[in-house]
Amino acid sequence: MRIQYKNWFMLFVLLCVVVAGLYGISGRLAGNREGAENRKEVWAVSKGKSAAAGGTRGTLKLYAGELSGRATAYHWETAGDQRVLSLLYQKVGDLAEVTWQKKGKGAVYRIRLKKDVMDSDGKLVTADTLLYNYYMRCQASYQGDDEIDGMSIRGLRTYRYGITGKKLRQRVKKVKQEIRKPDKKLRQQAVKELAIPVLYREYYWVKTLYYNKSAQKICDRYPEPVQLFAYYYAPDTSYTGKGKTVKQAVQDIAKQYGTNLEHLAEMTGRDYETKLQGMAIQYFWPDRAAGAGKIQGIQKLDDRTVRIETTGYRESDLPKLQNIYVVTRQCSGNASGEKESGAGKSGRSLPVGTGAYILQEEGKNMLRLQVNSYYHREAVNPTQIVIQNGDLTASRCIRSVCDGTFDMACIWERAEYEKKEISSTMKKGDALWESALLGGLVYHPGRVNTTTISKEAADTGDLGNVIRGLEMN
């Protein structure tokens, strides 16, 4: 009996030794694997690449809404454009603390950058970067959506016209006269560079009325968005837009405006006089297109701080200064987005920014974004985002999420209008027919980690903040 007990005891000890050995080996293997992954990540970041790049697990298939194909850091036309730009760029308000105080009739704004902000080239963003962004938007040649050039910044008019005193007043008078009675060349320039981009954006706004219940009556009168667009924006009331394509209608209406943009200003709530003045300055004095000298009211205080002084205070000035996208390297020297180096496999290039992603490829109806490895993110993926263009209903988006075409789709504009259709589509009951809705965001819970989606961002339509914290399953 004692011998049998001893044999069992020896067998037990032997098993313990074997298990301990296996556990130690597996632990070393796991540790080695983890160390290798860590080294891989460190190496990849040091090379300016993502360690997970190229893997399907890190790729998000996204529908962001309809895209115009003409968006840049300075101009957008659709809600989808804005969402994509929020992934590529950050605004001054995201990167800096802006404080201000009144001074006489004007105000002084102090813009101080956060520490260690880098762009997608891996270069530090400094006060010189801010100067570059503000000066560029003050030039006579600038025709972007921003309105920095319309602010009463001290010394701005001298910078734009390149002269002071009596001659400055003479030039201002000459420009105003030319705008009132433009020649053919200036009129054509105003149509092409100012009226057409603005009208495209307004057309896309008109389209949103067709899924807005409060606008149903007027939309019923004009079954085609082009016709309603003409009703709202054509100065010639006899122009109906009937039988016209969007491009034809936009060009026709833009020609009706020329340099007389008062009706357009009433419709959009924006002042285009400064942009027209800039065109006239370029027309008469081409050497002043990029400004002359320094702007007295824009000063660099230190490596991270810029001071801007205005001679007249307006409540709208603060958001104008905060809401511009920061770019660190220009592609074409203007706001048109014409082709140059800097944006991978696309027909045009976008300026370098500080957003979470960079544009890697642009196809006919597709964008491919690659992670900016210099951007500090909460999540390790998605490392790539493939964005499909289109004008899809909410129900179509849900079906596309369910069948795997998209992992996530933005339906903020349509969520309320298509409420019944959305509810019906999501009640299919098939086990494979799976999707979830948070705010105006449809996603597949099997492919997207639900716990990493910010409810606040989903409720407010902030795609940038949704993506920055997102994890894929």
Regions found by a protein language model. Give the residues of each.
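Sec-exported extracytoplasmic/periplasmic mature domains
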Residues: 118, 130, 135-143, 313-315, ...
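A structural "hinge/loop" feature
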Residues: 63-86, 315-331, 466-473
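Gly/Pro-rich hinge or "lid" segments in bacterial periplasmic/extracellular proteins
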Residues: 78-79, 266-296, 302-305, 309-396
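Extracellular/periplasmic solute-recognition and catalytic clefts
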Residues: 64, 360-368, 388-473
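Aromatic- and charge-enriched surface segment that lines or borders ligand/interaction sites
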Residues: 98-272
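Beta->alpha turn/N-cap motifs
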Residues: 65-67, 133, 311-314, 410-416
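Gram-positive cell-envelope targeting signals
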Residues: 1-53, 57-63, 72, 406-408, ...
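N-terminal lobe/hinge region of extracytoplasmic solute-binding protein
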Residues: 61-113, 121, 135, 352
